[in-house]
């Protein structure tokens, strides 16, 4: 059986990266929430 997680740096950045987050209203909300919480890493 093939495993579900097949790591790819490119896909990770495109789907969960900072620019991907900033491109939608909901994504900006995620970044704002993580900033408010004081996260060291805001996105992938």
From Swiss-Prot:
Coiled-coil positions: none
GO biological process, one term: translation
InterPro entries associated with the record: Ribosomal_bL34, Ribosomal_bL34_CS
Keyword check for Ribosomal protein: yes
Segments of skewed composition (Basic residues): 10-19, 26-44
Signal peptide span: none
Keywords: Ribonucleoprotein, Ribosomal protein
Gene: rpmH
Family: Belongs to the bacterial ribosomal protein bL34 family.
Organism superkingdom: Bacteria
GO molecular function: structural constituent of ribosome
Annotated Gene Ontology cellular component terms: ribonucleoprotein complex; ribosome
Name by which UniProt lists this protein: Large ribosomal subunit protein bL34
Keyword Oxidoreductase: no
Region annotation (Disordered) ranges: 1-44
């Amino acid at each position: 059986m093939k495993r579900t997680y097949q790591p790819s740096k490119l896909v990770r950045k495109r789907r969960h990266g900072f620019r991907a987050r900033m491109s939608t209203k909901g994504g900006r909300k995620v970044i704002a929430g993580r900033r408010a919480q004081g996260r060291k890493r805001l996105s992938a």
